Structure formats: structure tokens, C-alpha cells
């Protein structure tokens, strides 16, 4: 999950800027990224946060969360092709990056979903390509390290369908052949969620044996770009995400990994924004623990897509404007509530649990711009504030 943030420059020199939504900006504290990053990947080892790839190309950066005044330090460049939406997690003191999508070579006609895996060693500051292939496409998936040293992976786009669609789209000149182009797009985007064949297994990768396994099937529609928070050892909350291109779900699920299997439990959906505005769900939101609660912030959706899908119009986002959300929700383990607002609508950045709240790193704004700002969403169970 990668996502983004607000306007730090406006906060310089301001001790506290109150927002009508209940958010407050405090004194500057967290350093900006060297470059804007959206659709990248992130992981954490101890007090070190790592972010890169996506719009940053092969760049990779680290921040000491215990000493943020040192700023982001550039680490060794990723050695694979530049990739968006890779699944990344830490295990055994190293960072593993799986799949993602991009061009295999600079002169490739269309992007593909990669089936490759790489490992980063902070000790040697170096990347290596692993001698393995992902069993399925894992672009848009979420990865998380387990206590036994393995890595669990949820969701992911179907490589065969994704690659073929982008190759077919790339082969048509939409200006010269508008009808053929529209027919192709309508055909792909008009399928029901099940037809996209997104990964519905909870895959598990074992770095020690360099092998793959499964923790069982997801009983729900699989998601890409959901928000994810660790609730405890082996317990993970998956929130919202896409169920097909352009259509999100408001559902949230608790996954408990026990005795070699993943056990799923549906919890409360994200709440409607008002009596007149139903919850569309979001993709690319930020998430993490803040005290006893889980915060989910931002993300992107298409207002009206749920209504279209309910009416059987499966190209649900056709003609709809994409919306970058600024809503922040808090989950107490039973119910959700609206906690406040981000400084601006953001999605597809990184988030890290931090003392007192959730650290929001980079992401994409409503103009599609990759952002550099970093800030802390502080939550005391009642009020939300923003610390830069």
C-alpha cells in the first residue's frame, strides 16, 4: 500500500494551524522525502523505515524513526526494472520486494506484471535477485512478515489478463481507431469482479527455503491496494481496496494466521460519509495502529461507482471523476468512526506506526503529482492532529 500527504510548506513558522475538520498542524518535525514517491513500496526493520520505487524509479531511501533529524538517507538503487505497486515486507532483518508492474526494458511497448523477487540487505546496502518466480501476479498485493520468518501475501492482479490487456491497448492507435479502442476498453472494464481472477490465495514465501506455499483461500472477493494494519502477532486488518478496476469495497476483514492457515472474519464496513453519501470504499489508503485504534486515511475512489455496479453496470467508473479522499477513520476493534481530515486528499503512499500516531509518507495528490511531504497523524482516541 503506498499513499501521500499534505502541504508542509504552509505550516512552517506556524505553531498550530486549526482546520475546521478537527485536524491541527503542529511545529515542523518530520523531514520531507528527497523526491516525491507514489505507487512505491515500503517496509520497516526496527526503527528504520524504508521507502522507494514507484515514481522514484529505482531510488530507495531510509529514515531512522528514532532520529528523524538525520533525514532520509539514500540507499542502494533497486537493481530490477523500475516497478510500480510491488509487494514489500521485511523478514529476518532483510527486505523482500515481489512483483509490481512496469516495462521490462526501456523500449518495451507496454508494461507487464513482473513475476520476479528481490532482496535488500541493509547490512551490506545491496540488492540481489532471488532465484524464484512469484506463483501469480502480485502487483497491488500486500505483504507482511510473520513471526516464523516467512512472508504472507494478500491479493494481486492477474498477470495473464493484465499483460494481454495492456499489450492489446498499446497496439491500437486510439486517435485513428477510436471505435476499436473503445470496444477493447469496454470489454475489459465491463467484466464482473470474479472475471479478473485476482489472487485469492494467501500466499506465503519462506526466505530460508526459497519456496512458496499457501495459507488457504480468501473466502471474500480478493482486493488490490487495500489498506493494511498489524493488530497483533499473526493478526492483520485488511481494509477496503479494489475488487476490480475502478470499483472499491467498503468491507474490512480481520485475518488471523494460526497453525499454518489463514482464518478470515468480516468486521464492520467503513462508515458512510453522511446520510446522503454512501461509502464507496478506497484504494491506496494509509493505515496503521495509533494507540488502541487503527487509523485509515485517504485513498482514492470514483463517486458513483457503487451505484453503477449495483445497477449491473460493471464498467462502474466509466465517465466518473477519480477522487482523492482526505477522510480519516478510526476503528476501535468493533466500530468505525470518522476521526477527521488529512490536509489534502492523498493516496498510494506509505504509512508507518509511530509513537502517538501514524506516519504518512509521500503519495499522490488530486493532480496526480507525487508528493514529498511526511507528517504524523496524531490520535488520542478523541481528536486528530497533524504534526509535520
Swiss-Prot record:
Keywords: Carbohydrate metabolism, Isomerase, Kelch repeat, Periplasm, Repeat, Signal
Lineage: Bacteria, Pseudomonadati, Pseudomonadota, Alphaproteobacteria, Hyphomicrobiales
MF (Gene Ontology): racemase and epimerase activity, acting on carbohydrates and derivatives
This protein's GO CC annotations: periplasmic space
Primary localization: periplasm
UniProt family annotation: Belongs to the NanM family.
Highest taxon, organism lineage: Bacteria
TM region(s), chain numbering: none
Signal peptide: 1-26
Protein name as catalogued: N-acetylneuraminate epimerase
EC code: 5.1.3.24
Subunit field text: Homodimer.
Compartment(s) where it occurs, according to its Swiss-Prot or TrEMBL record: Periplasm
Kelch repeat start and end residues: 48-92, 94-147, 149-186, 187-232, 236-285, 307-356, 358-387
Function summary: Converts alpha-N-acetylneuranimic acid (Neu5Ac) to the beta-anomer, accelerating the equilibrium between the alpha- and beta-anomers. Probably facilitates sialidase-negative bacteria to compete successfully for limited amounts of extracellular Neu5Ac, which is likely taken up in the beta-anomer. In addition, the rapid removal of sialic acid from solution might be advantageous to the bacterium to damp down host responses.
Annotated catalysed reactions: N-acetyl-alpha-neuraminate = N-acetyl-beta-neuraminate
SUPFAM superfamilies: Kelch motif
Amino acid at each position: 500500500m503506498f499513499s501521500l500527504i499534505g502541504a508542509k510548506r504552509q505550516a512552517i513558522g506556524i505553531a498550530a494551524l486549526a482546520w475546521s475538520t478537527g485536524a491541527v498542524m503542529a511545529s515542523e518535525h518530520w523531514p520531507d522525502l528527497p523526491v516525491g514517491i507514489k505507487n512505491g513500496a515500503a517496509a520497516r526493520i526496527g526503527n528504520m523505515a524504508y521507502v522507494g520505487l514507484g515514481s522514484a524509479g529505482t531510488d530507495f531511501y531510509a529514515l531512522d524513526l528514532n532520529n528523524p533529524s538525520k533525514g532520509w538517507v539514500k540507499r542502494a538503487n533497486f537493481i530490477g526494472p523500475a516497478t510500480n505497486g510491488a509487494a514489500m515486507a521485511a523478514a529476518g532483518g532483510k527486505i523482500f520486494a515481489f512483483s509490481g508492474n512496469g516495462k521490462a526494458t526501456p523500449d518495451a511497448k507496454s508494461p507487464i506484471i513482473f513475476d520476479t523477487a528481490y532482496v535488500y540487505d541493509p547490512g551490506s546496502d545491496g540488492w540481489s535477485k532471488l532465484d524464484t518466480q512469484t506463483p501469480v501476479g502480485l502487483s497491488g498485493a500486500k505483504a507482511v512478515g510473520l513471526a516464523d520468518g516467512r512472508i504472507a501475501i494478500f491479493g494481486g492482479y492477474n498477470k495473464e489478463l493484465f499483460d494481454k490487456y495492456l499489450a492489446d491497448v498499446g497496439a491500437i492507435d486510439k486517435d485513428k481507431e477510436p471505435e476499436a479502442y473503445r470496444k477493447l476498453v469496454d470489454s475489459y472494464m465491463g467484466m464482473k469482479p470474479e472475471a479478473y481472477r485476482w489472487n485469492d490465495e494467501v500466499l506465503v514465501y519462506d526466505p530460508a527455503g526459497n519456496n512458496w506455499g499457501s495459507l488457504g483461500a480468501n473466502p471474500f472477493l480478493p482486493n488490490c491496494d487495500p489498506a493494511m494494519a498489524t493488530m497483533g502477532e499473526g493478526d492483520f486488518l485488511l481494509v477496503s481496496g479494489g475488487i476490480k478496476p475502478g470499483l472499491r469495497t467498503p468491507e474490512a476483514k480481520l485475518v488471523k494466521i494460526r497453525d499454518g492457515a489463514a482464518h478470515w472474519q468480516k468486521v464492520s464496513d467503513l462508515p458512510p460519509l453522511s446520510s446522503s453519501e454512501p461509502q464507496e470504499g478506497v484504494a491506496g489508503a494509509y493505515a496503521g495502529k495509533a494507540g488502541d485504534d487503527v487509523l485509515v486515511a485517504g485513498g482514492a475512489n470514483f463517486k458513483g461507482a457503487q451505484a453503477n455496479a449495483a445497477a449491473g453496470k460493471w464498467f462502474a467508473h466509466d465517465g466518473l471523476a477519480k477522487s482523492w479522499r482526505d477522510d480519516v477513520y478510526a476503528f476501535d476493534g468493533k466500530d468505525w468512526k470518522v476521526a477527521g481530515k488529512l490536509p489534502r486528499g492523498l493516496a498510494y503512499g506509505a504509512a508507518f506506526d509511530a509513537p502517538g500516531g501514524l506516519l504518512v509518507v509521500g503519495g499522490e495528490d488530486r493532480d496526480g503529482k507525487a508528493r514529498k511531504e511526511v507528517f504524523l497523524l496524531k490520535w488520542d482516541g478523541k481528536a486528530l492532529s497533524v504534526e509535520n
